[in-house]
Each structure stands twice: as structure tokens, then as C-alpha cells.
């Protein structure tokens, strides 16, 4: 097939997915020609073109042609992503039209249908890259904290050497200032910054402030994984306003959860420079975890406080008035900010440097507003230079990155290297001399101590090796979350947690479960 025929197939795809109407066909065709620098197209009958392929399959021969004819620097992931956004941007209307359609659907059919359709639209225009996401490995593992969710992240492509070299030569720019800024809408992109011609955002008002209900994450980790960001490029900051905004969002989108990463290094997310939340239509393991005790907060009638059975230190607020819940959350946050407990290795400050903050997550529970406050501390010491309440050295062979919002809630995002390393570990465990095989293979040597302990407590065969390793990875993740918990899952740790709760109520609290 010629390039013109491939583009006609792409047009048919756009018509089938209702990205364009028949009256947009010629206009969109000319935009595609312009995007590819086609000046004298050969005539082709659109009526003879039929297509039943997936979008990635439709784009593949276009990439090949573009690389062969010099329209694309190289046929690699980096340059394919730049070209695909440019081509699919030809099918995307102006932002105001996307917003109008969203608001119309929301008014007629409700917010759940509006977000569902916007999610499908984001897939159809290849903003959400479903083919890449499908590469991720998912499984669940039962633990004492409930069933934890596990993911080996294989969806994000690595930059190829050619793109890395080109990035070094390219002039650095501060536009857009970060990957979240609203200026990304329609942005052409470069080897240093992803293209966003097929990207649209939906505005949302939170507590009388203009925020933006961003598109769904291009590499979603769970259903309808969305980002809600501040209109201006301002750093992450947890305050009473944070809790009010989260609860305000739930008033408009009650079918979603919404949460914020912490605002300090080590315990925060990967982007601290732009205030934002993450949400979606997923019931995380932490949301399913029950409160072991429920208390009355003396100064906040109508708001209950529960200690969640979870490896991290989580306080769960519930109430039917969002304003009261936000007040109680702010009380917890302000108390925690200045709280120190030497017995529990908790210090609020080193000099003037603050260490205590929170990761808040909100959801609706019927008519109730539920707000989980996860206590965080980013202090380091000689024994734990990356963080006292951070994955410890013993688990770094699996994961040493920060524990952000998604993992706090019980979904592990493990590095892609583990896919091959765990396959090699399974083979070594089933070999004639497992210990030697583990130590001599550079892919498994770092896992040898862990794998040897696995052999001591589990019977491992060729048939069950993969399953055993996945189960043990789940238990490592539970331990990682325990490391990140400020009050430990010991008698001393639980006693320390209750000392903090006594501070909240100004006098010993009353447990409603006793």
C-alpha cells in the first residue's frame, strides 16, 4: 500500500471512532498531508479503503515510510511518539469544543458518564497508549494487610541513543515549565519534552479557584487514572486548602477517589514543582482496609477518627459535612507538623528544616466523606541516608525509589528491570546448584540473599517458581510499606501511635470499639 492509502485508513479510523465527521474528511486529510510534508499526493478513492486494524498497527507503516523518506529522524520510540501525537492531533478539535462536549455530557448524563467518555476519547486519539500499558505485568498477593496489587512497569519507553544525543544538542527551554503545565496543550514537543498535540484538559473549580481536571495519565496505572492540577505553576504545598480542595472535587466527581502526594522530598512524588492531585475510578487495597479502632475527636462532633489496619500509619476521618472533615484533617496535619517522639525516632525538625507532612486521600463512602491522612517523615540518618521512613537497604534490590501516593494506597510500581531479573532468578532456583547460579549471574547476584531465604521456607519447583517469586515480591512490598510507616507494626509502635492520638484530642481519646 502507498502512504496515501495508509493515511486513508487512518481517516477511516477517525470516522469510525467519531473523531471526525464526513464533512471533516478533506480538511483532516490535508492536515495529515501537511504534517508529513506531502505536497503532490497521488489520487486514491476513499471508498476503496477499508480498515479493521488497531491504531498502533495503522500507524506502524506510516512511521516506516516517514523514517525511510527522512520525515522522521529514526524509527525509534522517541520519534514515533513525536510523530503519532502530531498525526492524531489532526483529529482533535480545539480545546473549547472538547470542554463543551464534556460539559454537555456531564449535564445530561452525569459526571460518571462524562469521565468515561473522555477516557475513551483519550484512548482513541492515542493520548492514552493502551498498547504500551498492556505490556505491564499485573498480579495480586494476599498479605496480613489484605490483597496488595503488584505491577512491573514496562510501559514507559526508554530513550534511544540517537534521541539522547539530539537532546544534548538541543537548546534548553522553560516552555512549558513542566510536564503538568496547561501550556502543554497542543505543544509540538521535542526529544526533551513529549509532544502533546492530542492532549486536552477540562477545567474544574475547587474552592472558588481555577484548577484543571487534566487528561488521564498517558501511562495509566489503574482505571481512569487522572491528574488534577493547579492552573499556575506553583510548588506542592499541603495545607487546610488541600483538604478542602480534595473534598470539593468529590462533591463534583463522587465516583472518583482523589489524593495528593506529600510536599517534601523523599516522601513526595516525582513532581514537587507543580501542585497537583491524582484520582480515578479504582478501589485501592488501602480503601478496603478496615479501621482497627474508631475514636471520637472531642472538638469535631460528627467526625469519626479510625486507625487503619495498614503497614503505613493512616488515620481515617469520616463525616457527612466536608467542611467539618477538612477542619479535623487540618487539626491532625498541624499537630503532626510539630510532633516529635524520640522513642519512635520521630523528629519534626532538624534546625529549621521541617520533616513531618502527610499524604491525604479522599473518597466518598455513600453519603459520607472519607479522608485518609497518611503520616510521613522524611528525616535521614547515617544508617538510612535515603530516608529513615523509606525503603531500607535490605529491599533496595527490589525497589529503592520514593513511596508516592499510588504505592501508599497498596499498588506497587516496580522497575522494569525486575521482569528479566525475576525470570533469571526462577531459573537459578530450579538449577542443580541454585546458590552458585544466583551468585554468578550478574542479573541475580543482588537477589541471592533474598532468594536463598526463599528456598529455606518454600518448596520451589519449575512449575511453581514464578508464582512463588511473585508472592514473595508481594511480601517485600508489604515490608517496604512498613519501612515507610512512621509508627511501626510492633507493640511499641502501636503504643507510640496512640500517644500521638492522645495529642490530637487534647486528652485521652475514647475508643468506640471498646
Question: For each predicted feature, which ranges?
Answer:
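Active-site microenvironments that recognize anionic phosphate/pyrophosphate groups
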Residues: 1-228, 232-235, 309-311, 326-329, ...
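Catalytic or ion-translocation cores adjacent to nucleophile or general acid/base/metal-coordination motifs
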Residues: 241, 250-273, 279-340
Amino acid at each position: 500500500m502507498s502512504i496515501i492509502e495508509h493515511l486513508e485508513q487512518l481517516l477511516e479510523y477517525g470516522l469510525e471512532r467519531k473523531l471526525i465527521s464526513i464533512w471533516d474528511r478533506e480538511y483532516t486529510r490535508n492536515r495529515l498531508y501537511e504534517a508529513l510534508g506531502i505536497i503532490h499526493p497521488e489520487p486514491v478513492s476513499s471508498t476503496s479503503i477499508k480498515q479493521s486494524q488497531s491504531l498502533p498497527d495503522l500507524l506502524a507503516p506510516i512511521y516506516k515510510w516517514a523514517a525511510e523518506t527522512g520525515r522522521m529522524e529514526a524509527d525509534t520510540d522517541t520519534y514515533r511518539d513525536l510523530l503519532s501525537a502530531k498525526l492524531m492531533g489532526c483529529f482533535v478539535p480545539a480545546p473549547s469544543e472538547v470542554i463543551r462536549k464534556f460539559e454537555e455530557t456531564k449535564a445530561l448524563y452525569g459526571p460518571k458518564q462524562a469521565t468515561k467518555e473522555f477516557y475513551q476519547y483519550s484512548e482513541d486519539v492515542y493520548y492514552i497508549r493502551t498498547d504500551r500499558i498492556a505490556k505491564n505485568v499485573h498480579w495480586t498477593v494476599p498479605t496480613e494487610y489484605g490483597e496488595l496489587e503488584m505491577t512491573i512497569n514496562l510501559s514507559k519507553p526508554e530513550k534511544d541513543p540517537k534521541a539522547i544525543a539530539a537532546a544534548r544538542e538541543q537548546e534548553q527551554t522553560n516552555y512549558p515549565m513542566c510536564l503538568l503545565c496547561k501550556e502543554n496543550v497542543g505543544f509540538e514537543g521535542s526529544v526533551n519534552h513529549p509532544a502533546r498535540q492530542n492532549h486536552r484538559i477540562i477545567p474544574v473549580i475547587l474552592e472558588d479557584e481555577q484548577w484543571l481536571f487534566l487528561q488521564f495519565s498517558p501511562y495509566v496505572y489503574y482505571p481512569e487514572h487522572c491528574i488534577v492540577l493547579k492552573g499556575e505553576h506553583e510548588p506542592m504545598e499541603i495545607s487546610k486548602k488541600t483538604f478542602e480542595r480534595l473534598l470539593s472535587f468529590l462533591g463534583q466527581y463522587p465516583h472518583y477517589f482523589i489524593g495528593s502526594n506529600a510536599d517534601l522530598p523523599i516522601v513526595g512524588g516525582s513532581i514537587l514543582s507543580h501542585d497537583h492531585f491524582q484520582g480515578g475510578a479504582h478501589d485501592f487495597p488501602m480503601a478496603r482496609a478496615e479501621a482497627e479502632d474508631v475514636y471520637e475527636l472531642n472538638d469535631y462532633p460528627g467526625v469519626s477518627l479510625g486507625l487503619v489496619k495498614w503497614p503505613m500509619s493512616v488515620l481515617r476521618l469520616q463525616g457527612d459535612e466536608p467542611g467539618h472533615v477538612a477542619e479535623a484533617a487540618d487539626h491532625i496535619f498541624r499537630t503532626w507538623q510539630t510532633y516529635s517522639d524520640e522513642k519512635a525516632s520521630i523528629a519534626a525538625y532538624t534546625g529549621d528544616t521541617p520533616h513531618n507532612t502527610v499524604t491525604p486521600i479522599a473518597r466518598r463512602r455513600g453519603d459520607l466523606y472519607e479522608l485518609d491522612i497518611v503520616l510521613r517523615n522524611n528525616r535521614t540518618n547515617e544508617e538510612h541516608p535515603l530516608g529513615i521512613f523509606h525503603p531500607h537497604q535490605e529491599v533496595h534490590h527490589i525497589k529503592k525509589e520514593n513511596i508516592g501516593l499510588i504505592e501508599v494506597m497498596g499498588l506497587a510500581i516496580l522497575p522494569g528491570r525486575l521482569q528479566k531479573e525475576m525470570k533469571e532468578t526462577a531459573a537459578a532456583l530450579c538449577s542443580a546448584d541454585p546458590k552458585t547460579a544466583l551468585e554468578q549471574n550478574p542479573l541475580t547476584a543482588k537477589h541471592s540473599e533474598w532468594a536463598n531465604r526463599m528456598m529455606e521456607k518454600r518448596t520451589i519447583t519449575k512449575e511453581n517458581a514464578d508464582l512463588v517469586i511473585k508472592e514473595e515480591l508481594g511480601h517485600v512490598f508489604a515490608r517496604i510499606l512498613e519501612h515507610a510507616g512512621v509508627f511501626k507494626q510492633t507493640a511499641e509502635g502501636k503504643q507510640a501511635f496512640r500517644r500521638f492520638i492522645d495529642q490530637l484530642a487534647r486528652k485521652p481519646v475514647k475508643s468506640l470499639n471498646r
